[in-house]
Amino acid sequence: MSEVDFLNDAIAERFGFVRRARGPFLYTQKGVRLTDLYRDAGRAVLGWGGTGAFTMFKNVLSRGLTGSFPTCFSGRLLKAVETLLDSKRKIFVFNDRQKALSAAVVIFSEGTFFWKPWRTEGVVWSSADCVIVEPPLAWTPGIFILAVLDNEKNEAALAGLALSSVRISAAVEAACARSIYDIILAVQSKSEKDWFIYDTVLTKYWERRGPYLYPKVPKEKYCEFAEHCLDCAVVVSPFYDVPGIVPFGADPGVFSALKKKPFVMEKI
């Protein structure tokens, strides 16, 4: 059983099905509201539903643009990526993370960066030759955009390759572009003031770097910790090496059960 299957089964056993999701919350069949720190490994970093990308997806879908035929949205996706990285780019869409990385290594062997909002390491995105962007859309777990800096050196490298983009429907393409603009706005507006308010409870169990939560709990006790959190109505990342995310905009009181019932995490 995979980690995600384990998490889903644990939620269903305790609370029934998830009937609605909004912001950082999951609303369950048994009437319990869960605070989601996992958010599909960050693909729903801005929360569930209610985003501009979701509205854009519905609007384009209503126009019947669900095929892989040419539309104006390919150009909009390129423009969104160029705005995100503040540089002229050529983009290639892959449906597999490793395929995107393998292509990037051939183009520029000295290093490829995966774009991550609020990344704390000092990366100058505008000058990075190859950047892989995963749009922050929870319904597109298989879209990876390789953004290659548009210069003569990379143009020569690309000339020797037969790279082609995976065709995606206009509705998804439009949503991807809008999701990138959504995250650009969020990066500009959200900062430490939105994250530290949860430290009183969370930093006992996680090291917080920006909005990301890296476990302090010993790896051998992490599964037990995840179940304990679920009993306190908190959903954590099912993967030890995939960070959680603070629940933007939620009242710190959502962690009151975890505060009243702390997890004992001494090593076995």
Where are these regions (language model features)?
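Short Gly/Ser/Thr- and Asp/Glu-enriched loop/turn motifs at secondary-structure junctions
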Residues: 21-22, 204-213, 238-243
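Active-site C-terminal subdomain of aminotransferase-like
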Residues: 124-220
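Conserved PLP-enzyme active-site core in the AAT-like
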Residues: 7, 69, 73, 83, ...
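Glycine-rich loop-to-alpha-helix module at the N-terminal edge of alpha/beta enzyme cores
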Residues: 35-106
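PLP-dependent enzyme catalytic core of the Aspartate aminotransferase-like
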Residues: 87, 228-268
